[in-house]
């Protein structure tokens, strides 16, 4: 059913005039998530009680999801630590819809990662699908063409009954929406852990490309300019959706009752909306633009007005509806998908509407910019909102939540994995390799990723088997980008500061192994309840670790997202800071793949230092269900050096393949690279080395590289000159169909592939 415009109201409307004369009328502020003191502050701001519509507007905009009221005091540290040198290539940063970075030759890239965790548990398909749609619109709002997506997924234990429901819906939602948009999914992670059983994480990243002169920002400027709402009609779906779902914890009784709060997406509407926006930008028809996501029009109007140089008047009855009888508060706070709001000069309105008609996109003038400082919203001539917009969008409550190192932290850190029995014989080491490879933690993700289109649009250079996704940006010069996202809740649980830096280091390294230069960071910080001092300690430590790490690497945080209340009852998830890193390649033809066997008889070399580090490792998890001790040491100066060597080696043709070492250590990296290249190899461990430590340690800052035989001497000299440890550990044998660890064990590629690829189909097929 479509309804437009709305008919005159048949029920009494709570107007500003009425609110001023009924100061004692009870209002359900608590049911809307507002605290007593927050409600009193709204009354002080307005000098009266809020109308029902104003109350709804403040409640969604002052929610944890929209206002960052518990995290803002800590997030400021990102800005405080970012130097002018780090900002040099940043065209838009924290506070905008997405960060934008100069990548050279007049090109810019915008990228951001956001969460849609809570909706994806309540209704996995639509929760995940609209998570993709929302982050894509953030990228569109910067003036860019979206070119790729990635995802970071966390589910409960792989064999838990509800994991099948959630995983199936989430994967179908991501694939269904992204594939329909024609956007390649170029990477990500899927992790299983019991702590995510009631709180899955669905963090979606989108990357967009634009010419620097096409950059657009969200602001309403110029009195008399028109406000145009365009895209899908507005309905009841998503009322109080992500803004409310993401601002509370779940319990077993109410999670399924929250279904109506999950938005419903239409990827085909979004696809034409993308093309419509790009034509509007190309025609110079847009002054400012804002996508409609969490909190809907309440967010878009207040943010546009507060970022501009005037006020705004909106006629809410002009909003095209698809549901009859909606109240002003429902229209204002609906989170219906595939909608955008633009500021357009009067002389360009007709041209703007004509472009929208061409693309069959519904567009309606709903208001104008004023020369005042108020946001006024009317409903059939009656004023239902009259507020200072900054108090809604930017001046909400800010809390310095109590934080405290958990009493259990010392015991957790003292419980080292060193006490666990270790494999020693060749047979035991072989069994360990197969146990890790055949676990849900390290097995092939092909069952999931094959549901995504990785190469649509034809610009994907690396995706399958790659540490970082690589995209071509400029067909003429070959300029391109590499992106990666990483996280480790287990390491962050052991040490939040170091855990965040380890996630940053791995994402940075995953970009570096493609041959790209890392240039910028985005993040999505997933934690439990901010009302728990232990959670806030984890959060504060992780923020400082990430910010300090970025300073050490010389790359800025361009934006991000915080997701709190990821817990069921008192049980929080593992603290999970997701870090995305963007890198630049001058020529994508020189990118480094993961697969071995590109050159006959390649030499395998291990870069970096291997230490006895197993606390928080997958080995400890799989063999003993153990989590304790201290995470691996992180050396960001060494990470930076490693990236410089890989970039130079890629440029000079000294390396033919590279693969990051992370979970599962060297053994897992060798297996993945051999399977990717469908070639055998022989590994020769150093004589004085402990085979178990060499094969399975998860020490950071290490990369497996394949070096053409003719370039081994030059590459070794390059590493020696720069002080980077480089050890020859074997050769690629294209005539072999086995991975051999000399003197210890041999495993056929067929057995490795079967072990790895059979796990997820058996669990979820």
Swiss-Prot record:
Its main location: cytoplasm. Coiled coil: none annotated. Pfam families: AIRS (PF00586), AIRS_C (PF02769), FGAR-AT_linker (PF18072). It is found in: Cytoplasm. Its EC number is 6.3.5.3. One of its GO terms (cellular component) is cytoplasm. One of its GO terms (biological process) is 'de novo' IMP biosynthetic process. Mg(2+) 1 binds at residues 114, 561. Keywords: ATP-binding, Cytoplasm, Ligase, Magnesium, Metal-binding, Nucleotide-binding, Purine biosynthesis. It catalyses: N(2)-formyl-N(1)-(5-phospho-beta-D-ribosyl)glycinamide + L-glutamine + ATP + H2O = 2-formamido-N(1)-(5-O-phospho-beta-D-ribosyl)acetamidine + L-glutamate + ADP + phosphate + H(+). Residues 1-13 have a biased composition (Polar residues). SUPFAM superfamilies: PurM C-terminal domain-like, PurM N-terminal domain-like. Pathway: Purine metabolism; IMP biosynthesis via de novo pathway; 5-amino-1-(5-phospho-D-ribosyl)imidazole from N(2)-formyl-N(1)-(5-phospho-D-ribosyl)glycinamide: step 1/2. ATP binds at residues 68, 112, 523, 560. One of its GO terms (molecular function) is phosphoribosylformylglycinamidine synthase activity. InterPro entries: PRibForGlyAmidine_synth_PurL, PurL_linker, PurM-like_C_dom, PurM-like_C_sf, PurM-like_N, PurM-like_N_sf. The keyword Zinc does not apply. Residues 1-32 are annotated as: Disordered. Mg(2+) 2 binds at residues 138, 291. Substrate binds at residues 115-118, 137, 263, 335-337, 563. The active site is at residues 65, 116. The keyword S-adenosyl-L-methionine does not apply. Belongs to the FGAMS family. Monomer. Part of the FGAM synthase complex composed of 1 PurL, 1 PurQ and 2 PurS subunits. Part of the phosphoribosylformylglycinamidine synthase complex involved in the purines biosynthetic pathway. Catalyzes the ATP-dependent conversion of formylglycinamide ribonucleotide (FGAR) and glutamine to yield formylglycinamidine ribonucleotide (FGAM) and glutamate. The FGAM synthase complex is composed of three subunits. PurQ produces an ammonia molecule by converting glutamine to glutamate. PurL transfers the ammonia molecule to FGAR to form FGAM in an ATP-dependent manner. This is Phosphoribosylformylglycinamidine synthase subunit PurL. It comes from Mycobacterium avium (strain 104). The gene is purL.
């Amino acid at each position: 059913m479509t309804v437009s415009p709305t008919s005159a109201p048949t029920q009494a409307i709570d107007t500003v005039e009425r609110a001023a004369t009924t100061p004692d009328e009870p209002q359900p502020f608590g049911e809307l998530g507002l605290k007593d003191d927050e409600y009193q502050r709204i009354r002080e701001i307005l000098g009266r009680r809020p109308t029902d519509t104003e109350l709804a507007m403040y409640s969604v905009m002052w929610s944890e999801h929209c206002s960052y009221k518990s995290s803002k005091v800590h997030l400021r540290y990102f800005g405080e630590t970012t130097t002018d040198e780090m900002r040099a290539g940043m065209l838009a940063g924290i506070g905008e819809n997405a960060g934008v970075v100069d990548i050279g030759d007049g090109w810019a890239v915008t990228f951001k990662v956001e969460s849609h965790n809570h909706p994806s548990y309540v209704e996995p398909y639509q929760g995940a699908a609209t998570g993709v749609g929302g982050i894509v619109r953030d990228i569109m709002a910067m003036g860019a063409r979206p070119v790729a997506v990635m995802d970071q997924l966390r589910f409960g234990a792989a064999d838990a009954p509800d994991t099948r429901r959630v995983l199936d819906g989430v994967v179908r939602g991501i694939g269904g929406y992204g594939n329909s948009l024609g956007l390649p999914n170029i990477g990500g992670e899927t992790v299983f852990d019991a702590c995510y059983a009631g709180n899955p994480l669905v963090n979606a990243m989108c990357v967009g490309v634009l010419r620097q002169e096409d950059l657009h920002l969200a602001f309403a400027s110029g009195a008399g300019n028109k406000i145009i709402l365009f895209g899908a009609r507005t309905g009841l779906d998503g009322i109080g959706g992500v803004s409310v779902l993401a601002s509370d914890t779940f319990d077993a009784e109410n999670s399924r009752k929250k279904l109506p709060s999950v938005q419903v997406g239409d990827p085909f509407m979004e696809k034409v909306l993308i093309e419509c926006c790009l034509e509007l930008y190309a025609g110079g028809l847009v002054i400012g633009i804002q996508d409609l996501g969490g909190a809907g029009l309440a967010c878009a109007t207040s943010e546009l007005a507060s970022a501009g140089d005037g006020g705004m008047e909106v006629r809410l009855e002009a909003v095209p509806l698809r549901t009859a009888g909606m109240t002003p508060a429902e229209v204002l706070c609906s989170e219906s998908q595939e909608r955008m709001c633009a500021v357009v000069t009067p002389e360009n309105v007709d041209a703007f509407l004509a472009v929208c008609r061409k693309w069959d996109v519904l567009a309606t003038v709903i208001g104008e910019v004023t020369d005042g400082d108020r946001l006024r919203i009317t409903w059939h001539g009656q004023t239902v909102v009259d507020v200072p917009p900054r108090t809604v969008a930017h001046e909400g409550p800010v809390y310095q939540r109590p934080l405290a190192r958990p009493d259990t932290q010392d015991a957790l850190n003292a419980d080292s994995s060193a006490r666990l029995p270790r494999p020693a014989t060749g047979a035991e080491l072989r069994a360990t390799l197969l146990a890790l490879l055949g676990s849900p933690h390290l097995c092939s993700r092909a069952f999931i990723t094959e549901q995504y289109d990785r190469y649509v649009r034809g610009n994907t250079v690396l995706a399958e088997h790659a540490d970082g996704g690589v995209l071509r940006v400029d067909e003429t010069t070959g300029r391109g980008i590499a992106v990666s996202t990483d996280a480790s809740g287990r390491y962050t649980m052991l040490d939040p500061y170091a855990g965040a830096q380890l996630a940053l280091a791995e994402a940075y390294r995953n970009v570096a192994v493609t041959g790209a230069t890392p240039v910028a960071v985005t993040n999505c910080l997933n934690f439990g309840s901010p009302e728990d001092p232990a959670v806030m300690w984890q959060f504060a430590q992780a923020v400082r670790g990430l910010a300090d790490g970025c300073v050490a690497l010389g790359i800025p945080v361009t934006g991000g997202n915080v997701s709190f209340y990821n817990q069921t009852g008192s049980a929080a998830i593992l603290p999970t800071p997701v870090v995305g890193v963007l890198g630049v390649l001058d020529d994508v033809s020189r990118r480094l793949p993961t697969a071995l066997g590109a050159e006959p008889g390649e030499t395998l070399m291990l870069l970096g230092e291997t230490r006895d580090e197993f606390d928080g490792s997958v080995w400890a998890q799989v063999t003993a269900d153990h989590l304790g001790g201290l995470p691996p040491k992180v050396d960001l100066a060494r990470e930076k050096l490693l990236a410089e060597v890989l970039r130079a080696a890629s440029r000079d043709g000294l390396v033919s393949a590279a693969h990051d070492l992370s979970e599962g250590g060297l053994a897992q990296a060798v297996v993945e690279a051999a399977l990717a290249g469908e070639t055998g190899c022989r590994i020769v461990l150093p004589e004085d080395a402990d085979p178990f430590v060499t094969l399975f340690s998860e020490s950071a800052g290490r990369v497996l590289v394949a070096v053409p035989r003719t370039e081994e001497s030059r590459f070794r000299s390059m590493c020696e000159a720069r002080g980077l440890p480089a050890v020859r550990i074997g050769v690629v044998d294209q005539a072999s169909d086995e991975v051999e660890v000399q003197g210890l064990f041999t495993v056929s590629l067929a057995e490795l592939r079967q072990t790895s690829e059979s796990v997820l189909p058996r669990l979820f097929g």
